[in-house]
């Protein structure tokens, strides 16, 4: 039997030490409890469970000031749910309908008082038009000239030198700065002068169907010299939304100076009566859904009731104004777009077309053959360029000027065109250009295509045309290819791509991509 251990007697010191330890632990425990009350410990993560749809309270419906994008996630729609797909389909249909409605042409007569363009620049639209009533008749290098005073000075031919001096002497309009003459809201695609010689009145058409009118003869407002805070008022400019898409071309009636015709990519041709202030539809397809963008119009001087037009679908049409607007005879000439065309001013049965198929073609409206879709005017001759041809413009002397993307202005000469019989076959040799002028025609996406426009009835007898220059000028050339002037000036900050001559006076207008007007007189 093992011996019994002797019980250990706890000393006073050891007992006191254990009491102190117990007391200290009690204090620490109390502090921890107090801290938990002030800053609770993070709750332990709850076990995950299957998600259940939240019960959403019905929100108070508020009338939105304008359409806003809404989150499908916040709306409680799952990414692949049928409800979300339907919602997206409806939104897409609404946007497509809005876009289509914006581009849809407006049929019937339009009162200019109802279609004025809104904005500070055009607040006096009706007042501006009232001034017209009663009138009877490759990479660009901005600022770098390609025709200078030296070219004029070194001209040996006296007649040419005098003409160059006169044309180069045209001055940029000074009553208002170019930046203040915003004739239309968007990029200018077309321009023309009113035929009156009393004062320069310019019409411009923009990318979205607005037509602007500016009377350059209007007086400048008087500002007191001692009034330092006075603001210089803007010029009076009228602007009207006559079309729903780009206005591609203007033409005045040969017999009525109060009638101006406009053509548009919205597939319509309209006639504006300046005295009555009414815009009437002259041509439009029978179906409002048919798309037939019109690229240019011209009116025969021998028959002002007829309107000839070209389309971006490669067709040429003839509309008699005395018949209903959808009764035009239309001929398919090419599978490519026709960017521009013109009639011979003295022999308007001769048509010159410029096309994306790289050709200049001459047609004869006196001889139309074929049946159905194969019916078309007689093709007299054609010339093919290296790249697409943008425009073909007849002069009254029988010259055709074209611009093309091979960076050339070509001039063709047909002085005996009036002697051609119907269906005359032009020899290939005669279809060659007599002059080729190097010219940067690379406009890119944001500048309107450069197109030559002849002066219709020059008072001085010199045949000349104007065309925009990518270096922010307007070039003027004679029928033999000699450059006569390069018009510029201070304050021109964009390319005056759309250039146009007054029919008789030496007035030249240029329109920019920002809707600004440059005018030389």
Swiss-Prot record:
Annotated stretches, region: Disordered: 36-75
WD repeat coordinates: 183-224, 242-282, 333-373, 382-422, 490-521
Gene3D superfamilies membership: YVTN repeat-like/Quinoprotein amine dehydrogenase
GO terms assigned for molecular function: DNA binding
Signal peptide limits: none
Known function: DNA-binding protein that binds to both single- and double-stranded DNA. Binds preferentially to UV-damaged DNA. May be involved in DNA-metabolic processes.
Similarity annotation: Belongs to the WD repeat DDB2/WDR76 family.
Protein name per Swiss-Prot or TrEMBL: DNA damage-binding protein cmr1
Organism: Neurospora crassa (strain ATCC 24698 / 74-OR23-1A / CBS 708.71 / DSM 1257 / FGSC 987)
């Amino acid at each position: 039997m093992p011996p019994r251990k002797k019980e250990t007697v706890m000393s006073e010191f050891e007992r006191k030490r254990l009491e102190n330890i117990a007391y200290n632990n009690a204090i620490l425990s109390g502090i921890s409890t107090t801290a938990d009350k002030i800053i609770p410990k993070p709750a332990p993560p709850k076990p995950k469970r299957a998600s259940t749809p939240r019960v959403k309270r019905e929100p108070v419906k508020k009338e939105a000031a304008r359409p806003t994008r809404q989150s499908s996630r916040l709306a409680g729609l799952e990414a692949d749910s049928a409800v979300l797909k339907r919602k997206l389909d409806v939104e897409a249909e609404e946007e497509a309908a809005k876009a289509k409605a914006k581009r849809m042409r407006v049929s019937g007569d339009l009162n200019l008082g109802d279609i004025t363009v809104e904005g500070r620049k055009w607040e006096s639209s009706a007042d501006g038009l009232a001034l017209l009533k009663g009138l009877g008749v490759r990479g660009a290098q901005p600022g770098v000239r390609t025709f200078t005073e030296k070219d004029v000075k070194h001209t040996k031919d006296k007649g040419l030198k005098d003409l160059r001096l006169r044309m180069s002497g045209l001055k940029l309009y000074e009553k208002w700065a170019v930046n203040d003459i915003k004739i239309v809201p968007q990029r200018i695609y077309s321009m023309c002068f009113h035929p009156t010689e009393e004062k320069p009145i310019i019409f411009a058409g923009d990318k979205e169907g607005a037509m602007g009118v500016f009377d350059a003869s209007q007086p400048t407002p008087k500002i007191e010299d001692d009034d330092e805070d006075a603001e210089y008022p803007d010029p009076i400019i009228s602007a009207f939304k006559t079309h729903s898409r780009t206005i591609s071309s203007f033409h005045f009636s040969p017999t009525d100076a109060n009638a101006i015709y406009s053509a548009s990519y919205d597939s319509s041709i309209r006639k504006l009566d300046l005295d009555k202030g009414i815009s009437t539809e002259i041509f439009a397809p029978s179906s409002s859904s048919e798309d037939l963008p019109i690229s240019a119009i011209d009116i025969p001087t021998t028959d002002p009731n007829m309107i000839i037009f070209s389309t971006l679908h490669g067709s040429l049409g003839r509309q008699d104004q005395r018949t209903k607007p959808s009764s035009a005879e239309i001929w398919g000439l090419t599978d490519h777009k026709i960017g521009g065309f013109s009639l011979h001013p003295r022999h308007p049965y001769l048509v010159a077309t410029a096309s994306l198929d790289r050709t200049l073609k001459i047609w004869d409206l006196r001889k139309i053959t074929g049946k159905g879709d194969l019916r078309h005017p007689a093709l007299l001759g054609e010339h093919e360029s290296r790249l697409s041809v943008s425009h073909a413009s007849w002069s009254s002397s029988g010259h055709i000027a074209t611009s093309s993307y091979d960076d050339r202005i070509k001039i063709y000469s047909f002085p005996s065109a009036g002697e051609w019989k119907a269906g005359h076959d032009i020899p290939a040799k005669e279809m060659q250009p007599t002059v080729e002028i190097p010219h940067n025609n690379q406009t890119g996406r944001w500048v309107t295509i450069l197109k030559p426009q002849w002066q219709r009835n020059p008072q001085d007898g010199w045949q000349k045309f104007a065309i925009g220059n990518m270096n922010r000028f307007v070039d003027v050339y004679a029928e033999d290819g000699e450059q006569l002037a390069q018009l510029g000036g201070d304050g021109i900050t964009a390319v005056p791509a759309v250039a146009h001559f007054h029919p008789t006076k030496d007035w030249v207008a240029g329109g920019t991509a920002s809707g600004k007007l440059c005018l030389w007189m």
